């Protein structure tokens, strides 16, 4: 849906720019303002009150969305031997070691997440400049550097997402599809927000959640009340 299209303008007119919405209201509006031609992804953007230039204010983590993302992630696994066999059995889409690294160096990036066993990380470091900027570098903090490749693959295939603050102090993550029930979207939002709040750096001062916007890939942004940090599926009290 182009921002200049009639459909986009009509969708944008449904949003009151003089107010902020509860997570449940935002989920309903996201569904209403999404293009009817495709099952659009519902995304969240959050501006955090942190300084990402400071190492102690880096916000990152993972969350298992209770209702999944609506998309089965493609997973790459760096492993050999029995661990590689376990990754294949768990449903990994591409598994390898030096061969997979060479393939990625050649331009292959047809996967949404990457997992590595600890013994492979020295090799994977050779492609850190390729994977890192795309948020694909395996990391122990997100559970993607692990000897238990079966669990890691199952978690990601089951709706586990990663979040990481960017240089502008923004977080971006997916909470589902426009075809989801609004309560499922609100519950996914709540699960992610709980983890983001838990990840708040102790050195962060002032307001942590500065701005929250929900949108679909085809629709306008919907401002969400950043002070709502519980009871995500409740209708707001009418004033």
Curated annotation (Swiss-Prot):
Q: Which GO terms describe its molecular function?
A: rRNA binding; structural constituent of ribosome; tRNA binding
Keyword tRNA-binding listed? The answer is yes
The record ties this protein, via Pfam families, to: Ribosomal_L1 (PF00687)
List S-S links within the chain: none
Q: Does the keyword Secreted apply?
A: no
Q: Which GO terms describe its biological process?
A: regulation of translation; translation
What are the GO cellular component annotations? large ribosomal subunit
Entry's Gene3D superfamilies?
Answer: 3.30.190.20, 3.40.50.790
Signal sequence coordinates: none
Q: Per UniProt, which keywords does this protein have?
A: Repressor, Ribonucleoprotein, Ribosomal protein, RNA-binding, rRNA-binding, Translation regulation, tRNA-binding
Sequence similarity: Belongs to the universal ribosomal protein uL1 family.
Summarizing the function annotation, the protein's role is: Binds directly to 23S rRNA. The L1 stalk is quite mobile in the ribosome, and is involved in E site tRNA release.
Complex and partners: Part of the 50S ribosomal subunit.
What's the protein name? Large ribosomal subunit protein uL1
Report the source organism: Mycolicibacterium gilvum (strain PYR-GCK) (Mycobacterium gilvum (strain PYR-GCK))
Q: Source gene?
A: rplA
């Amino acid at each position: 849906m182009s921002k200049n299209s009639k459909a986009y303008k009509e969708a944008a007119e449904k949003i009151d720019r003089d107010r902020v919405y509860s997570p449940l209201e935002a989920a309903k509006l996201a569904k209403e303002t999404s293009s009817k031609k495709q099952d659009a992804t519902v995304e969240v953007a959050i501006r955090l009150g942190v300084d990402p230039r400071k190492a102690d204010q880096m916000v990152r983590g993972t969350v298992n969305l209770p209702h999944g993302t609506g998309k089965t992630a493609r997973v790459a696994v760096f492993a050999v031997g029995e661990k590689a066999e376990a990754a294949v059995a768990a449903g990994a889409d591409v598994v390898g070691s030096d061969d997979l690294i060479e393939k990625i160096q050649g331009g292959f990036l047809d996967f949404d997440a990457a997992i590595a066993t600890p013994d492979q990380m020295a090799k994977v470091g050779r492609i850190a400049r390729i994977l890192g900027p795309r948020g694909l570098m395996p990391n122990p903090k997100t559970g993607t550097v692990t000897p238990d490749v079966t669990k890691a693959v199952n978690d990601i295939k089951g709706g586990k997402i990663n979040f990481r603050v960017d240089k502008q102090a923004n977080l971006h993550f997916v909470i589902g599809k426009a075809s989801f029930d609004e309560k499922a979207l609100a519950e996914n939002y709540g699960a992610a927000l709980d983890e983001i709040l838990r990840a708040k750096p102790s050195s962060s001062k002032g307001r942590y959640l500065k701005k929250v916007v929900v949108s679909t890939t085809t629709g306008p942004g919907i401002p969400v009340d950043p002070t709502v940090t519980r009871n995500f599926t409740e209708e707001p009290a009418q004033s």
